[in-house]
Each structure stands twice: as C-alpha cells, then as structure tokens.
Amino acid sequence: MTIPRRLLCVITDQQSNPVELARMALEGGARMVQLRRKSASGRDLFEWAVRIQALCREYEALFIVNDRVDIALAAHADGVHLGQQDIPVASARALLGPETLIGVSVSTPSEAAKAAEEGADYLGVGHIFPTSSKEKPMPPIGTSAIRPIIEASGLPVIAIGGIELQNVAEVIKAGASGVAVISAVSGSADPVAATRELVKRIRQ
C-alpha cells in the first residue's frame, strides 16, 4: 500500500464528533482520515474506528489510527501513525503485517533516516508553521526542512502543523507528497467546503 501524491489527510480534533467530521472530510475530497483523540477510551476509539473505516471504504480513501496499534488492528484500519515515543516501528509491523501502512512523526533528517531504516512507509513532518492544535516546545521547522528529510529517508512526506488554504501550495511546492490538517477543516463553519478548497489548492 502506498501514499497517493497530492493527498489531503484530515485529522480528527478533540471536540467534534469524529465520525461526522470524517464523513464531511471525505465528502469534500480528503483521501486520508486519521483518528486521533488522546483522551478517549479504547471502546470509544474502537467504535469510531469501525465506523470511519466503513466510510473510508465507501469513498475509497485511507484510514489511519493515531498511536493505537491495537485499535488499528481490531478495526482493520489501513494504517497506524506513530510518534517518537510510541511503540517501535518493527514491533508495530510484527503485529500489523507487511501490507499495513506505518507512518512516523519526525522533525529532523536523523529521525527520518531512523524511521526509514526501521521500515516506516511514510513520514509525518512538522510542525511546519505555528499551530494552536497543541503546545509545541520547539519552533516551527518551516518548509525548507521538507527536502532534507525526504533526501535522508527516501520516504513520502505528509506535512503537518499550521497548514491552511493560504500556505498549502507552498508546502506541496517544497516537496511534500501531501498535507495533514486539523483546525483548517474542523474549525471551519463548513468542513465540506473547507476540505474541497484545500484539495483544489493541493492539486493545482
């Protein structure tokens, strides 16, 4: 399984109904949905994951679970996205098998090279711009960081962090295979339209 070029991934936020947000994102043309809800119970995550996976099948999109390998496995997700402090890629691969996508969050070429060596399929790179989605101890890395990370890893990059309609084209031009957003869609009064506009800008 591979990451399509010029992909928009919509990540669920901490407030919205994740299933409804996923439905609107898919209707707007998102090619990937990531379920991320740090405070949710395992049962809630599993129930949401099963429903979002069904929606993604309907729209022929990819479904990724953040952090939770167990939920990804139980819900037959297309992949899992791991942070630097999560279960190692090799351990996740042993549980999920060779066909499941495994993404890893990185912010430096050395982290990228390590993730590639361990068998990651793609990289989540950021945060690119200032973002309000969570507290960030480090400053944004900017679009200039994307190319060295690609060169160090040879993996497709999905950029994240402060990406919105006004700067998404800059991110794609810098070499990213796709972008991931949270508030640019979930914080919009019309998530379907917001997704559609982002997809249009990405594909220009």
Curated annotation (Swiss-Prot):
Q: Which GO terms describe its cellular component?
A: cytoplasm
Instruction: Give EC number(s), comma-separated.
Output: 2.5.1.3
Write out the pathway annotation from the protein's UniProt entry: Cofactor biosynthesis; thiamine diphosphate biosynthesis; thiamine phosphate from 4-amino-2-methyl-5-diphosphomethylpyrimidine and 4-methyl-5-(2-phosphoethyl)-thiazole: step 1/1
Annotated GO molecular function terms are: magnesium ion binding; thiamine-phosphate diphosphorylase activity
Name residues in a coiled coil: none
**Positions that bind Mg(2+):** D67, D86
Reactions it catalyzes: 2-[(2R,5Z)-2-carboxy-4-methylthiazol-5(2H)-ylidene]ethyl phosphate + 4-amino-2-methyl-5-(diphosphooxymethyl)pyrimidine + 2 H(+) = thiamine phosphate + CO2 + diphosphate; 2-(2-carboxy-4-methylthiazol-5-yl)ethyl phosphate + 4-amino-2-methyl-5-(diphosphooxymethyl)pyrimidine + 2 H(+) = thiamine phosphate + CO2 + diphosphate; 4-methyl-5-(2-phosphooxyethyl)-thiazole + 4-amino-2-methyl-5-(diphosphooxymethyl)pyrimidine + H(+) = thiamine phosphate + diphosphate
One Pfam family this chain carries? TMP-TENI
Keyword hit for Metal-binding: yes
As for what it does, the entry says: Condenses 4-methyl-5-(beta-hydroxyethyl)thiazole monophosphate (THZ-P) and 2-methyl-4-amino-5-hydroxymethyl pyrimidine pyrophosphate (HMP-PP) to form thiamine monophosphate (TMP).
UniProt record similarity statement:
Belongs to the thiamine-phosphate synthase family.
What is the protein name for this chain? Thiamine-phosphate synthase
Origin organism is Chlorobaculum parvum (strain DSM 263 / NCIMB 8327)
Q: What is the lineage of its organism?
A: Bacteria, Pseudomonadati, Chlorobiota, Chlorobiia, Chlorobiales
